[in-house]
Amino acid sequence: MVTEQEVEAIGQTLVDPQQPLQARFRALFTLRGLGGPGAIAWISRAFSDDSVLLKHELAYCLGQMQDRQAIPVLVDVLCDTHQEPMVRHEAALVNMAQ
């Protein structure tokens, strides 16, 4: 069982733009595997990042989690016209599959 503090440490790595992208992706995939509200919250915080590739993977991973609690996050991303088309497209695909 992973503690709340461990989830927070993983989440901090994900949202830290000073971390190498490889470490941030590892954190994302770890959170995806853990699932739950804490993981969804940390993943949702990362949508303000500058990396389009990371944000695309955030949406993809939220969809892979198959957790209805992620739907409002994905809808917000889809409706956010400041998000890149590739990111919004992935959020739309995930929502259609739900």
Task: Spell out what each predicted region is.
Residues 2-15, 36-48, 67-79:
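Amphipathic alpha-helical scaffolding segments comprising HEAT/armadillo-like alpha-solenoid repeats
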Residues 32, 63, 96-97:
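Structural signature of alpha-helical solenoid repeat scaffolds
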Residues 14-20, 47-53, 80-86:
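Short coil turns that connect the paired helices of HEAT/ARM alpha-solenoid repeats
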Residues 88-98:
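Short, intrinsically disordered, charge-balanced linker/junction segments flanking boundaries
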Residues 12, 17-34:
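Alpha-helical segment of the N-proximal tetratricopeptide repeat
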Residues 52-63:
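Generic detector of contiguous secondary-structure segments
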